[in-house]
UniProtKB/Swiss-Prot annotation:
Keywords: Ribonucleoprotein, Ribosomal protein, RNA-binding, rRNA-binding. GO terms for biological process: translation. InterPro entries: Ribosomal_bL9 (IPR000244), Ribosomal_bL9/RNase_H1_N (IPR009027), Ribosomal_bL9_bac/chp (IPR020594), Ribosomal_bL9_C (IPR020069), Ribosomal_bL9_C_sf (IPR036791), Ribosomal_bL9_N (IPR020070), Ribosomal_bL9_N_sf (IPR036935). This is Large ribosomal subunit protein bL9. GO terms for cellular component: ribonucleoprotein complex; ribosome. PANTHER family: 50S RIBOSOMAL PROTEIN L9. Belongs to the bacterial ribosomal protein bL9 family. It comes from the Bacteria.
Length: 150
């Protein structure tokens, strides 16, 4: 199925590109999320009229994402208390939701889907580097310190 992308989509393309995708991916994900429209003659003409407006909107969201990333980088360190054993092993684990909640409590809104844990959930006390994907091209890094609860 041919679609016109209205936003940058990872591993697919950027704004305005006409790409071939499977019908289910287009119907169930791209179109409902507002990331694409079917590539009919009418939609192609409509898109060409609105191209500048959509590019400006995309640049605006990118700038907002970079501002959020700068705030997260400024924050630098987030401390999360958790129950742990004697050797520094946690009872349970710290996942994306816990990290997102801690960053939100520090004053910057972050959803759990934006948190990237390269080595899976955190199971030990100490310092851990975590990256936050604020936008498809904008990343921020953060140091998460897990301390044992008293």
């Amino acid at each position: 199925m041919q679609v016109i992308l209205l936003d940058k989509v990872a591993n697919l393309g950027g704004l305005g590109e006409q790409v071939n995708v499977k019908a289910g991916y287009a119907r169930n994900y791209l179109v409902p999320q507002g990331k694409a429209v079917p590539a009919t003659k009418k939609n192609v003409e409509y898109f060409e009229e609105r191209r500048a407006e959509l590019e400006a909107k995309l640049a605006e969201t990118q700038a907002a994402a970079e501002a959020r990333a700068a705030k997260i980088n400024e924050l630098g360190i987030v401390t999360i208390p958790s129950k742990a054993g004697d050797e520094g092993k946690l009872f349970g684990s710290i996942g994306t939701r816990d990290i997102a909640d801690a960053i939100t409590a520090a004053g910057i809104n972050v959803s759990k889907s934006e948190v990237r844990l390269p080595n899976g959930v955190l199971r030990t006390t100490g310092d851990h580097d975590v990256s936050i994907q604020v936008h498809s091209e904008v990343f921020a890094s953060l140091n998460v310190v897990i301390v044992p609860e008293a």
